[in-house]
């Protein structure tokens, strides 16, 4: 995925991170972003798909709202930990080990999808595959929400213009909002799937 040598890029790399104490520090922020709450309030989805779900806290939030939630991550360690986190939960999301650029094991279409920190790790070729998969897995007119770092680990400078261009054939960039999540310059992107 990424070209920076010190950045985790493969599922094995992320498995090591998720098995370390660093994972707790890096992904321990359990607050649900306002943007995700708004996604639910505005769209009133029955189904949701999270790409790069990690430990599954956002998919768990969706399930708690009564949404049939599915979370995907290529780290088997993250998915194992996500499943353990919800073992006693009343409403459980489905967690799947999978590559966000090739999700052939999923055949349903979702009312919404979202990605909080995955897209910015992909190279240009992977981004194109990602867009194709999100298009295939979302219902026409559905919203895909992305949070991405502006100076991404993949060395690609992300911006509203760049995101609009990458998604142009399948989605309309409906809204962007600058963010300082985790003290990092970033943006939220609301993309609407073509009919």
What are these regions (language model features)?
Residues 112-125:
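A short SAM/SAH-binding and catalytic strip from SAM-dependent methyltransferases
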């Amino acid at each position: 995925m990424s070209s920076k040598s010190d950045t985790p890029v493969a599922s094995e790399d992320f498995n090591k991170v998720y098995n370390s104490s660093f994972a707790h520090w890096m992904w321990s922020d359990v607050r649900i972003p306002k943007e995700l709450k708004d996604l639910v309030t505005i769209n009133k989805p029955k189904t949701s798909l999270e790409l790069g779900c990690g430990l599954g806290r956002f998919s768990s939030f969706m399930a708690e709202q009564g949404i049939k939630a599915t979370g995907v991550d290529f780290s088997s360690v993250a998915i194992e930990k996500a499943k353990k986190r919800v073992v006693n939960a009343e409403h459980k999301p489905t967690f799947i080990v999978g590559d966000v650029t090739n999700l052939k094991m999923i055949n349903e279409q979702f009312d919404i999808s979202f990605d909080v920190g995955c897209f910015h790790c992909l190279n240009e070729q992977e981004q194109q595959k990602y867009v194709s998969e999100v298009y295939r897995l979302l219902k026409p007119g559905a919203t895909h929400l992305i949070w991405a770092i502006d100076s991404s680990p993949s060395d690609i400078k992300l911006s509203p213009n760049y995101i609009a261009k990458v998604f142009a054939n399948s989605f309309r960039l409906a809204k962007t909002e600058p963010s300082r999540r985790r003290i990092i310059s970033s943006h939220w992107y609301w993309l609407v799937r073509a009919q």
